[in-house]
Amino acid sequence: MGHHSCCNKQKVKRGLWSPEEDEKLINYINSYGHGCWSSVPKHAGTYTHIHGFCLQRCGKSCRLRWINYLRPDLKRGSFSPQEAALIIELHSILGNRWAQIAKHLPGRTDNEVKNFWNSSIKKKLMSHHHHGHHHHHLSSMASLLTNLPYHNGFNPTTVDDESSRFMSNIITNTNPNFITPSHLSLPSPHVMTPLMFPTSREGDFKFLTTNNPNQSHHHDNNHYNNLDILSPTPTINNHHQPSLSSCPHDNNLQWPALPDFPASTISGFQETLQDYDDANKLNVFVTPFNDNAKKLLCGEVLEGKVLSSSSPISQDHGLFLPTTYNFQMTSTSDHQHHHRVDSYINHMIIPSSSSSSPISCGQYVIT
């Protein structure tokens, strides 16, 4: 840092000011004013009966000594909280322009403001930022969000439930094979139509109904209403059940391919095969893994119909007929349009191994 030209002259004193020097400077400025600071040491240092001997100080040193220590309007003592807040606000605008900041603080010098900033305010701000400011900000935001009104039915307590439903809908719309049992629901029986359970164009399966209200069967604590389904049916894992929560009335509805099951699970299922004994067509009911039964290729399948057990059957093949169960469904919920049908879905799944079916052997379809 360079020195003023007057400081390079000889007989210029540096360092601490003595009380005599302070008195000479105060007496001169009170009598004549400071004017040009470069001329103050010369006039103040003239030997007179008033000022005594000259000051051996440069003009800059006289100015700083007067402004920072000797002026009568100088405000001494600690900074008030109002002054500290004003300094923080001005510093955010002006930065380290201490002289500009000091102009807004009567009686405070730029050097005093700078020292107060570096020694007190800056340290407190840094400590507050690292330890308490972040938590205070989060608490303020939390209280603000807590006090906000719920618009359009939004409630922070239901965010997790809504997110779960949203993700479930994404999974449902993306891959139906990953639907959980909690999403399985069906409309009331009076709105269920065959279109909701479409058959293949080759007529592999058909959704059968009956009007006999006297027949009922209890299974898995669920009641089924007037629904005839082929039996026996397997009990599969509920983690990968398809959903029937919304089935559009579309004749061209394509069912997705469902996962395979081991042979031991489906060994009890019956299949309807067609054989020809000379000119007579026989309806043969065998299981896929029945070693004693005669395994023949599938012939013509009647479109939209299930082969009836009243057709002529050959007793030489050791045949057995599929049985049907009638389950009575009673609604125990106030919501008549949707029911939980986890067990019902289990009884609606039967195998298909018809070579003419678009769904290949070993897969399951919902009838």
Curated annotation (Swiss-Prot):
Q: Which PANTHER family match?
A: MYB DOMAIN PROTEIN 55, TRANSCRIPTION FACTOR MYB26
InterPro entries under this entry? Homeodomain-like_sf, Myb_dom, Plant_SW-associated_TFs, SANT/Myb
Identify the keywords attached in UniProt to this record, alphabetized.
DNA-binding, Nucleus, Repeat, Transcription, Transcription regulation
Specify one Pfam family: Myb_DNA-binding
Could you identify this protein by its name?
Answer: Transcription factor MYB26
Q: Which SMART domains match?
A: SANT
Task: List each copy of the HTH myb-type domain by range.
Answer: 9-70, 71-125
Q: SUPFAM superfamilies annotated for this entry?
A: Homeodomain-like
How is this protein annotated for GO cellular component? nucleus
- Without the gene, what phenotype results? Male sterility due to a defect in anther dehiscence. Fertile pollen.
Main location class = nucleus
Induction of the gene: Down-regulated by auxin.
One GO MF term attached to the UniProt entry = DNA binding
GO biological process, alphabetically ordered: plant-type secondary cell wall biogenesis
Tissue expression notes: Highly expressed in flowers.
Where is this protein found?
A: Nucleus
In terms of PROSITE patterns, this protein maps to: HTH_MYB
Q: Which residue ranges does the Swiss-Prot or TrEMBL entry mark as DNA-binding? A: 37-70, 98-121
Function text: Probable transcription factor that regulates lignified secondary cell wall thickening of the anther endocethium, which is necessary for anther dehiscence. May play a role in specifying early endothecial cell development by regulating a number of genes linked to secondary thickening such as NST1 and NST2. Acts upstream of the lignin biosynthesis pathway.
